[in-house]
Amino acid sequence: MLGGFFALMAAATFAWTNAVVRRGVVSGSVTQAITLSIPPGPPVFLAALLLSGNPGMIGELSHLSVLVFAGIGISHFCLGRYFNYSAINAIGNNLAGPVLQLNLLVSLSLAVFFLGEKLTPLRALGIILIVAGPTLIRRGKKSARAAPLAFTPRFAEGYAFAFLAALCYGASPVLVRFATEGKGIAASLSGGVIASAAATMVMLLLLLIPGHWRELRAVSPQNAKWFVFSGMLVYVSQIFAYMAVAIAPVTITAPIIGLANIFRLYFAKLLTPDHEMFGREVYLATVISFLGVVVITASADSLPLPDAVKAFLGWQWP
């Protein structure tokens, strides 16, 4: 399925983005990261819209869609990104990842209640597994790594920010699918232009605050490169995500995007091995969350099960 492929690409690029941000916030600040990573959005989305061959779609969106996409820009690109980067700064990618995957619960809940998508026993089991991952990390965090770390994790702060980021990120797929109004990929990319432009306007307004501008000017050239690159890459990730939810159900695409937790382990090992926690609990929690993703996307019809079991698994709610 093309939507599944787009979702998988979104997961990989999003995980790489978080690893790049982690590299930058080791010595830089979250404020510097979000201020420099947001402005690349409009040109990146606009280029994708032009390549889609239907740039005029941006003028065909309803007023409601425009407002929803603008709201997504502020909630996802500004607030969600701030919470996400703050969580990464406090506890690193590997500890923040399973908590951030709770965004899947938000997406599925909204998809069921507002988009009319269905919840099945398999999806319910997947949700339980996804929730179990962060719980395991929280209980085993003291023994998560035997070797000394180059940083001291701030667990309460990190988990709180990761949870808030999950709320913001979880609402986005449902809102994007709602705002595209069934008009396809070009509509989703048009919405991306609007969302990123709204987020950029907010960032420009924040620069009027003297302290914000002063902190931005203090960024080192090396960190500036990491933050700008992460901004460009995260919008590539968003392009894939927007296209995925435009052509496939949220209950399918959102879990696949959750595979970012698997990718982030390898990218973190590559870029910031001394600023992440690698241990049995971290890996086990990620595997459990991944199993939840697999279960959620599984189809009972494709499994060699007795008819009675298939009938039970075929139950839908609501």
Task: Spell out what each predicted region is.
Residues 33-34, 96, 188-192, 253:
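Juxtamembrane helix-start motifs in multi-pass secondary transporters
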Residues 10, 41, 100-103, 165, ...:
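Structural signature of transmembrane alpha-helices in multi-pass secondary transporters
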Residues 1-31, 36-71, 81-91, 139-161, ...:
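Membrane-interface interhelical linkers
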